[in-house]
Amino acid sequence: MADRQRALLLGAIALGALALRLSHQWRWALWGSDSGEYLFLTAALVGEGALLQDGYLGWGRAYPWFQGMQILAASAALLCGTPLPATLFWLIPAAGALAVPALFLAGRRFVSSDAALVGCGCYAVAFPVVYANSHAMPGGLADPLGLLLVYAFAGVLAAPRRWAPPFSILLLGLLLMHHFTLLLAVAGCTGMLALETAAGSRRRAPYFALATAAALTALYWIGYATGFRTAILGDTGLPLGVLLGAPLVALGAMRLLAPRLPLPSLQAPRRPARLFLGAFLASLLIIGYGIVYDVPGTSIPVGPDAVPFLLPPLGWLALAAAPGLVLAQRGGWLLYGWTLPIVGLAAVGGLTGSHLLIAYRHAPYLMAPLALMAGAGFMALLRMQTPPHRPRFAASLASILLCGALTAYPPVAVMGGFQEGTTNAELGCVLWTGQVEPGALIVSDHRLSSLAFGLGKHNASWEQGADVLVSAGIVREVSTPAAGTQEVGYVLLSDEVRAGVTLLQWEAAQPLSAEAAAKFDSATYSAVYDSGRCQLYRQAPDSLM
């Protein structure tokens, strides 16, 4: 394929990815379950001219300490004179779509340009990527930076002096933006270095680059982001010294052991189509596991309704199942070095039930290297076709990707009952909470709590108000995430919340029981605002009962 054709096709894929990520902005009043908190922090930055960190009363313990997204959105709104909510909710997912050209740049380090282009097409419609990054969130904006960090580190492996400055700049950007993206990007770089060392490289500069990255990350996470440090120490149960020393010890051990790591020589299969078909059928068994045993590390069932939405990504992921074809590429081993640490961290999260390394959160990050592997597999199959049959063969992949685009937003029932979209009725009810007396606690599920906090400027309950919502009895007090124990003032309910109360990330949303729903018709709860499909109830104080 000529360079001009390749550039035009990449542009078309990037525009398609942009349109796909923004498509749900037209379907909902707001899209994104944490939008309220992000808007609250961004508005505080614009209004006060300083980052709100200490004393933050929201749910996200990491949000105040990683405000790169808020800085970008606030700067754009001030410079362009655009409304802050529109700037945040449209600019961030649009900027996140730059991950597609970023993947193409990174992909050319590992596979051919055509294979990287095919990988971009797969990545652009992968529903774990689209769904996760289609709303304003730091992870979506950090996605292009993470891919570019991998790209720069591949350059550090070959030409350290030239690529160390870009690597450092991207590292600093990720430090400000998103901790989880930084963790997985650096983990991928570490895996690449391990296999590069096993292949015979003795350069010291890449080790210095990763040691510097580990030191800067430790300084930021442990030294500066005090609230985040408390969360890490509490969730892991590890001593501070272990967290500080573990990355450097791991790098030292890798420096000693990686040269002794044997790299097997794998031949490219003569009939890869059979291997790809077998991989696709095996993936169906994995779906069956999810139906029987839930998503690893969670209590969220997959369910047979998810099968139509999983088939398109599984169709192209099967093309990544030929290691011999991948290793025949210019950077095949490096590509596996990028992938395997992410797989390992996901496995740890799934096996231990860790709430820091939730297994399904790794899926969007795995899609990038796997898409490049799939691109290599597809190009190998394409070359095996006779010239007259190649257009039809390419059209078959295009049809799979089109199906992927059409199924990139699974319904609530498929997503464990989790609802990312906010209706006009819910938004109107949330905005009305601005008339509620200051200091009153509003109880709702995770999504509406975020909006009541961010738009209504009220303390909210998030998952800690579960008993107020789901129990048949009356609950008077709630322990909030950061504002201490407070008396319940109001309860915010909508038809969507009644259909599925979203609480913890690792538990499926459950509908309100008939007994729990009935109590809101009692004298204890009076509807002070009713938009038809969303109600704000005032809970009577105990002294009045």
Sequence positions of predicted segments:
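Membrane-interface transmembrane helices that cradle and orient dolichyl/undecaprenyl
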Residues: 147-163, 192-201
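Extracytoplasmic
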Residues: 101, 109, 139, 376, ...
